[in-house]
């Protein structure tokens, strides 16, 4: 966990991936820092301080989800993104709102389990290598055939058999020592071995996913699982691949799942972040239709955000200190259309601004995962170095901005469609052409995109 970052450091880290939206970055940075501050308080005071949930308002593609996702990744906190439209009111078929908490705990368990497996990796690899040695040099099968009754009575050949077995054991030990050295030197990596691994059983309760009954299915499956033995199956793998599989198995044996569960539930309760997207789609007063009541979904979300105990397969989880970040474009509705109780549970309001041409230019070149860098890396695998002139970058940004203005505004996602169309021919021919370097100029951009961008009817379908 990295809760020690200052708000300024958090904003600087987010700047590496997200352009603009300073207000949103500041809001999440303060929310994260307050968690660190809360952890330093005396226990009685700590219990009184709940996180201040955030409501992000802004059009699609401006970075709402990315801000929350990068924030969670930065501190290693359990994070899930859910869509408000996927939930249904209690009593209807569909996912109930408590499933978001169960998903958060599952994510937390996975994170903690991976961390603990890393800690025991060296020991697990050592045990996996030992198993590989035993597979490569197996113990001889002991003779269990019919014994002469006279030999059993007088023990005629007993000493001879014992001597023979001890000689075999000595030879096997020598062979295993040699194989150990070869394994350590990496000489047997491509050798094919047959190993027994625990079979991953597909659950008959998978069909319950998305029906709101998955928790019942999990509990029933766990009850059955304790009675049914685990199946194993044989797999033929190279030593290199077998080591990975066996190391994973040994690591899972070495970690204490009770400890994992305890830590995971604690992290979910104290550090968890739930991002509720499209909350504007359940806002509004029109609840008298044949559709599932949107207001009913809001009322179901309310107790989770306020603080409740949710039953999960890992035990009861308190939602009092989980940070909720809700987001919506609010094109057809406004935040005041949410029920008053839910509005009050999101005291921090952040409005994200529409992206300008300058923002598009920065998005194309500045972030660590910038689109221009991604396409350059992809084409470099074909031996082609691609370079964009500053004027070409500007031209791409202007076209993206203009198409957003003329059609639906989908924010930075427009750049993906623009770049795909721009480099479509080059990507198709890259494996066949002999050019070592290609420079993208404004004229090239104009040739590939301008005609389409100017024709509003065409750009709606292509860009």
From Swiss-Prot:
Example of a GO biological process term: protein unfolding
Major localisation: cytoplasm
Family of this protein: Belongs to the ClpX chaperone family. HslU subfamily.
Binding site for ATP: 19, 61-66, 277, 341, 413
Any single Gene Ontology cellular-component annotation: HslUV protease complex
InterPro entries hit by this protein: AAA+_ATPase, ATP-dep_Clp_protease_ClpX, ATPase_AAA_core, Clp_ATPase_C, HslU, P-loop_NTPase
One MF annotation (Gene Ontology) recorded for this entry: ATP hydrolysis activity
Subcellular localization(s) per the UniProt record: Cytoplasm
Subunit field text: A double ring-shaped homohexamer of HslV is capped on each side by a ring-shaped HslU homohexamer. The assembly of the HslU/HslV complex is dependent on binding of ATP.
Taxonomy, superkingdom: Bacteria
Role description: ATPase subunit of a proteasome-like degradation complex; this subunit has chaperone activity. The binding of ATP and its subsequent hydrolysis by HslU are essential for unfolding of protein substrates subsequently hydrolyzed by HslV. HslU recognizes the N-terminal part of its protein substrates and unfolds these before they are guided to HslV for hydrolysis.
Entries under SMART domains matching the protein: AAA, ClpB_D2-small
Alphabetized Pfam families for the sequence: AAA, AAA_2, ClpB_D2-small
CDD domains: RecA-like_HslU
PANTHER family associated with the record: ATP-DEPENDENT CLP PROTEASE ATP-BINDING SUBUNIT CLPX-LIKE, MITOCHONDRIAL-RELATED, ATP-DEPENDENT PROTEASE ATPASE SUBUNIT HSLU
Keyword tags: ATP-binding, Chaperone, Cytoplasm, Nucleotide-binding, Stress response
Name by which UniProt lists this protein: ATP-dependent protease ATPase subunit HslU
């Amino acid at each position: 966990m990295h809760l020690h970052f200052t708000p300024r450091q958090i904003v600087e880290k987010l700047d590496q991936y997200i352009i603009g939206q300073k207000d949103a970055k500041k809001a999440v940075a303060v929310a994260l820092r307050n968690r660190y501050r809360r952890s330093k308080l005396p226990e009685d005071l700590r219990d009184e301080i709940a996180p201040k949930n955030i409501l992000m308002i802004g059009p699609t593609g401006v970075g709402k989800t990315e801000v929350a996702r990068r924030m969670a990744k930065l501190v290693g906190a359990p994070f899930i993104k859910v869509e408000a439209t996927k939930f249904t009111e209690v009593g209807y078929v569909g996912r109930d709102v408590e499933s978001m908490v169960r998903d958060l705990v599952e994510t937390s368990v996975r994170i903690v389990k991976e961390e603990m497996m890393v800690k025991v990796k060296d020991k697990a690899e050592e045990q996996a290598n030992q198993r590989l040695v035993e597979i490569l040099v197996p113990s001889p099968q002991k003779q269990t055939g019919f014994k002469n009754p006279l030999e059993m009575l007088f023990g005629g050949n007993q000493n001879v058999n014992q001597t023979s077995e001890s000689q075999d054991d000595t030879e096997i030990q020598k062979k295993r020592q040699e194989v150990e050295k070869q394994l350590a030197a990496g000489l047997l990596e491509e050798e094919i071995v047959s190993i027994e691994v625990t079979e991953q059983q597909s659950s008959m309760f998978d069909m319950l996913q998305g029906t709101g009954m998955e928790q019942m299915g999990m509990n029933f499956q766990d009850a059955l699982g304790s009675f049914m033995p685990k199946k194993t199956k044989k797999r033929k793998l190279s030593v290199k691949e077998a080591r990975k599989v066996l190391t994973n198995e040994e690591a899972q044996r070495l970690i204490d799942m009770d400890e994992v569960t305890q830590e995971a539930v604690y992290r979910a309760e104290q550090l968890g972040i739930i991002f509720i997207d499209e909350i504007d789609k359940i806002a509004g007063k029109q609840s008298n239709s044949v559709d599932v009541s949107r207001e009913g979904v809001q009322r179901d979300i309310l107790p989770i955000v306020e603080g409740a105990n949710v039953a999960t397969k890992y035990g009861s989880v308190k939602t009092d200190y989980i940070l909720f970040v809700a987001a919506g474009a609010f094109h057809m509705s406004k935040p005041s259309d949410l029920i008053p109780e839910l509005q009050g549970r999101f005291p921090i309001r952040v409005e994200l601004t529409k992206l300008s041409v300058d923002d598009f230019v920065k998005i194309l070149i500045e972030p660590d995962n910038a689109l221009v860098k991604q396409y350059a890396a992809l084409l470099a695998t074909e031996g082609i170095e691609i370079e964009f002139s500053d004027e070409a970058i500007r031209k791409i940004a202007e076209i993206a901005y203009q198409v957003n203005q003329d059609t639906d505004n989908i924010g930075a996602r427009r750049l993906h469609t623009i770049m795909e169309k721009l480099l479509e021919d080059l990507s198709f021919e890259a494996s066949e052409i002999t050019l070592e370097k290609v420079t993208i100029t404004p004229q090239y951009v104009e040739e590939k995109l301008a005609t389409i961008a100017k024709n509003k009817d065409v750009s709606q379908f292509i860009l």
